[in-house]
Amino acid sequence: MWTGVNMDSSKRQFLQQLGVLTAGASLVPLAEAKFPFSPERHEGSPRHRYAMLIDLRRCIGCQSCTVSCTIENQTPQGAFRTTVNQYQVQREGSQEVTNVLLPRLCNHCDNPPCVPVCPVQATFQREDGIVVVDNKRCVGCAYCVQACPYDARFINHETQTADKCTFCVHRLEAGLLPACVESCVGGARIIGDIKDPHSRIATMLHQHRDAIKVLKPENGTSPHVFYLGLDDAFVTPLMGRAQPALWQEV
């Protein structure tokens, strides 16, 4: 568990600068507080663009994706990179309440709002579109957490750094599926390279192009987690009253 004793000097230096900025925010632009060098980002290949399609018609809310993700990525208790939320939606002019399942995770946007707000360039987008966090640079300021419109980030209290779904990039690079995709009982989650027209995800996105939806399209983030069978109440804006996930005690 992170204790703060071995924090490297560059992080200490930045936190000292951040304290100065906080005291005189109107005088010094945040962008001036940086690590002494800018990192080179070469991870991934521009020949690929990874995305996920979630077929809600096949999701049963079993939370196997949540459990397998937690095991694979060793997230702290009570913190999740992905989960399936249950919502209650009431139609306008109707007394009927419908229960709706909605898997949530980082949307790996083309225009990720979490990236430009990071003062130390710890959050960045790979050339294949996957958004990741460099834990060696992250100082846990939580600016990216606040900037994410999908509530997909959190501060890992063990590492004291930002945490989120990475599409299990370590598994993708080994030729494996993300833990959530591999464990999905209903086969609701599909991941692949949308630049490959023969990939399963590209084929399905084309076949169902009139039914594919994303969350909060009005934000202009160009999310790359696509939904098939998404209730209109969750498109613009995300509405409905969130209920405890099915696996939680209520």
From Swiss-Prot:
Signal peptide per UniProt: 1-33
Upregulation: Transcriptionally regulated by Fnr and by the TtrR/TtrS two-component regulatory system.
SUPFAM superfamilies, per the entry: 4Fe-4S ferredoxins
Membrane topology term: Peripheral membrane protein
Binding locations of [4Fe-4S] cluster 2: C69, C165, C168, C180
Gene3D superfamilies: 3.30.70.20
MF terms (GO), sorted A to Z: 4 iron, 4 sulfur cluster binding; metal ion binding
Plastid among keywords: no
Stretches assigned to the 4Fe-4S ferredoxin-type domain: 50-79, 97-128, 129-158
PTM comment, free text: Predicted to be exported by the Tat system. The position of the signal peptide cleavage has not been experimentally proven.
InterPro entries found in the cross-reference section: 4Fe4S_Fe-S-bd (IPR017896), 4Fe4S_Fe_S_CS (IPR017900), DsrO-like (IPR054822), ET_IronSulfur_Cluster-Binding (IPR050954), TAT_signal (IPR006311)
NCBIfam families, alphabetized: DsrO, PRK14993.1
Assembly: Probably composed of three subunits: TtrA, TtrB and TtrC.
Name of the protein in question: Tetrathionate reductase subunit B
The species this protein was found in: Salmonella typhimurium (strain LT2 / SGSC1412 / ATCC 700720)
